[in-house]
Amino acid sequence: MLILSGRVYCGAFPKFLYHQYNLQLVDLSHIQIKEGFPSWLLHNNTKLEFLYLINNSLSGPLQLPLYFHTNLSNLDISDNCFQGYIAPMIGTYLPRVRYVNMSGNGFRGSIPSSFGNMSLLQTLDLSNNKLSGSIPEYLTIGCISLVELILSNNSLQGQIFSRTFNLRFLGELQLDGNQFTGSIPHSLFNCTFLRVLDLSHNDISGKIPWWLGDMSYLEILDLSMNNISGNLPSNFCHTNIQKLYLSRNGLQGSLKDAFYGCFELIVLDLSHNNVTGSIPPWIGKFSQLSYLILGHNNIEAKIPIQLCNLTQLSLIDLSHNHLSGPILPCLRSTSNSYRQQDGSYNASAPVSMDEPLEFTTKSISYSYQGSMLSYFSGIDLSCNHLTGRIPTEIGNLNEIHVLNLSHNSLTGEIPASFSNLHQIESLDLSYNNLKGSIPSQLTELNFLAVFNVSYNNLSGKIPDVKQFATFDESSYRGNLFLYGCPLMKNCTEISLPPSKSRTSIENKESSCFIDKDAFHASFGVTYIMVLLVIAAVLYINPYWRQVWFYYIEVSTNNCYYFIIDNLAFLSKFRFCNFCK
């Protein structure tokens, strides 16, 4: 057994390994080996069962041993710089392997059909390479023990599986980020233990099969970014499905009967489709729902009051629909990073999200996933027909990061309670009928990076301190009675008596700006004066002159030894990241 993972910096394979013949486990991960894969490592150690070379800088092809290696069980060479073709006979020379991870390399060409000889294989991960062609039929027949098949982010094409299919124990199938065509194969119905099915970012067409809703173990279904069409399936959920991603397809029809019964849902993403009708009242029974993404559809009617029953919501996106009526004062949005199972909060236990979700932040659509999504919360109700006042209760969402209510018909004033949105980064209230002034309390929002109230009926002076000093004219345009920086007008233009002179107006208009030339000149004079005072003190007082030179000498020595001590570390750091 040899385990050097992350403990030393080798740069090359340790030479003593060439003389080892009885090793059963070798773990040389994360030590930045930078050379080709040595065939003698497998050839010499015929008893080797576990080989881990994760996250190094290995390059060239993966060389097989000269003879069959019947003891190797786990092979992980992920996150390296391997290139070329995967050896066509890999399944013949390594017939008893149970775990193969070759992801994150530069392998190209087709997937060898000899993988089908690995009858004990349980996990095959070839994701994030440059593989092309189709999935070999022999792989789907011979790998009878396969539990995880991960081929994401390659250039694979053709039908997903042929009719001949024998992966009965398959639990996780990830084929996202390829060029697969055709419909979802009915043969997947035989995978009764399937928990994760990710076919996103392909060219799959047809309808959503009814039998997907009958797969009792299915937890994650991702069919987003395809060409799937037809109506939403009725009575779809008879399972414990938790995450459902169907965005950016051509789905249509009503939500009325589509997902009733999916009471374990955490994620429901139907954005960028042609969904019609209203949001059904039974949405309030989805007590675990954290992410409700229904933007860019044709949903109409009012926002149902039952939505307020969803206490776990982190992201709500109902934008670009035809919703009407008032904004519910009871809407909630809470970051998952603080929530525990009992409803209390714990910052150390975020909910991990592996699949990305699109959400518009700071006027740009971003994809959030993983821990970042777990710490993120927001509400987007923009581009609808919402009316009435903005509820003051919205100001109680002190964990929300994004609030977008733009392009509606909202009236009334901006609630002063928005000053309680301590985590807010983007606040968009543009294109409404809001009136009154911008509450001065909003200057306490220290994380506010985007603020937009353009094209309303606001009046009064624009706050010009803290974050508000960073917003440009586009944040306020279209409000006739707003004045102050950064708008090129002053309140005196509206209410100034006739006796006031034009010179007075111009002086007040220019009060927002600083003469750069005067600033630079005054700064230079001040700087020179400070230097002259210091020089005069040192010349007159011998004691201070001695202290000053002593301080200079000590500082110079400290800087010198700091650079010498850290130079080796910096050189090593640059070398470690050379291949990345």
Regions found by a protein language model. Give the residues of each.
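Terminal membrane/secretory targeting segments in land-plant proteins
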Residues: T492-K580
